[in-house]
Curated annotation (Swiss-Prot):
Belongs to the AccD/PCCB family. A zinc finger (C4-type) spans 31-53. GO terms for biological process: fatty acid biosynthetic process; malonyl-CoA biosynthetic process. InterPro entries: AcCoA_carboxyl_beta (IPR034733), Acetyl_CoA_COase_Trfase_b_su (IPR000438), ClpP/crotonase-like_dom_sf (IPR029045), COA_CT_N (IPR011762), Znf-ACC (IPR041010). Residues 27-290 form the CoA carboxyltransferase N-terminal domain. Its cofactor is Zn(2+). Zn(2+) binds at residues 31, 34, 50, 53. This is Acetyl-coenzyme A carboxylase carboxyl transferase subunit beta.
Length: 290
């Protein structure tokens, strides 16, 4: 027995590994900002916002939609649209192999989920990026699901909301992915002509072709706190201009200060804030909204 073993009380000595077999893995999460060790269930109940420092962690598309939409009357749009390898693209790995890996890891078929439903009884269509699926990259499926979501909003005469979380256009689809920038913005023109609100919610990260196309075209542009928002990443810009960028450059607070976005809203207050905005923009009563 070492001198340390003699000093340590029996209760805090290392537990026998055999006695830990019944403890499930993944019970704890470490906050990437303040590094606090947090109980996973508490973090999930808090919509993946750190209760210690209010850092907004990344959240899955379906989990976000579950916390946003009313439980009744939800329906998914465009889930039957699946990705194809039209260009037979291959870098270090084949595109179908990357797709299969992403599908297995996320249980999604591509990087966007679109649902119709209601927020505080106000009807709406919501598109939500899944960043865990190939970095939320925008390819043909994402563009088509976005377009069908906007079309559904037109047919139902309801507002359209999009939560962005993307690294940009999908490299493996080349020109086809770049075409989605034009496709998505064209659909928003139809919404504008019909005088239907489009609300864009920028989450961490919103970059590349997504930020350069529809992300900033909302009638109201909202961002989550400290979200990274821009076209090229800060390291790429620094290497190009050979200068040190200002502190907080490309963060939501910096963009709000420069007038590039309209407001920053805490994720835990987004449901109520969106309902109030929808009621205001559509001139409907929002009596149910707290």
């Amino acid at each position: 027995m070492s001198w340390l073993d003699k000093l340590l009380p029996p209760k805090i000595k290392q537990t026998d590994p055999k006695s830990r077999k019944g403890i499930p893995e993944g019970l704890w999460i470490k906050c990437p900002s303040c590094e606090a060790v947090l109980y996973r269930n508490d973090v999930e109940a808090n919509l993946h916002v750190c209760p210690k420092c209010d850092h907004h962690m990344r959240i899955g598309a379906r989990e976000r939609l579950d916390g946003l939409l009313d439980p009744e009357g939800r329906y998914e749009i465009g889930q039957e649209i699946l990705p194809v390898d039209a260009l037979k693209f291959k870098d270090s790995r084949k595109y179908p192999d990357r797709l299969k890996e992403a599908m297995d890891e996320t249980d999604e078929t591509d990087a966007m989920v679109v649902m119709g439903g209601a927020i505080h009884t106000l009807p709406v269509v919501v598109a939500c990026f899944e960043f865990a699926f190939m970095g939320g990259s925008m390819g043909s499926v994402v563009g088509e699901r976005f377009a069908r979501g906007a079309q559904n909003a037109l047919e139902q005469n309801v507002p359209f909301i999009c939560f962005t979380a993307s690294g940009g256009a999908r490299m493996q689809e080349s020109l086809l992915s770049l075409m989605q920038m034009a496709k998505t913005t064209a659909m928003l023109t139809k919404l504008s002509e019909a005088k239907l609100p489009f609300i864009s919610v920028l989450t961490d990260p919103t970059m590349g072709g997504v930020s350069a196309s529809f992300a900033f075209l909302g009638d109201v542009v909202i961002a989550e706190p400290k979200a990274l928002i821009g076209f090229a990443g800060p390291r790429v810009i620094e290497q190009t201009v050979r200068e040190k960028l200002p502190e907080g450059f490309q963060r939501a607070e910096f963009l709000l200060q420069k007038g590039a976005i309209d407001m920053i809203v805490d994720r835990r207050k987004l449901r109520e804030e969106l309902a109030q905005l929808m009621a205001l923009l559509t001139r409907q009563p929002a009596d149910a909204v707290a």
